[in-house]
Amino acid sequence: MELNELTEKIIGCAYEVSNVLGSGFPENVYEKALQHQALKTGLIAERQYQMKVFFDDILVGEFFADLLIGQTVLVEVKAVRALDELHVAQAMNYLKASGMPICLLINFGRPKIEIRRFVPYDVWKEQPHFAHHRIR
């Protein structure tokens, strides 16, 4: 499946979760619901996907992305009143460390969900139509 098509399917799943659950639940509720909806639509979706961070070929840390969908799209789920620069930095760092081609930051904490896409610069150069935020 093409990357843009995959992200649109994931976004559709997020809207379905938002339409059914609304806002006000903790993040893990939305994370589980989004995984369920993605699986229901035939996508591969792993929760709490573990990744490692290396510096000079030395393991310096580990982190868990909320979801990895389609084996290529990281999804970071939030349930906050407003996304801030720390949420954006987290999504960008996860994307850089993972080497994945895209990260979706999805906030279910408002009546209308907020979705931001992040892509590495090299992917953005090839497909600029699909980046909201590019990272170098």
Q: How should these model regions be labeled?
A:
Residues 22, 45, 65-83, 94:
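Conserved catalytic cores of phosphodiester-cleaving nucleases, focusing on short active-site segments
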Residues 17, 21, 25, 56-59, ...:
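Glycine-rich, flexible loop/turn motifs
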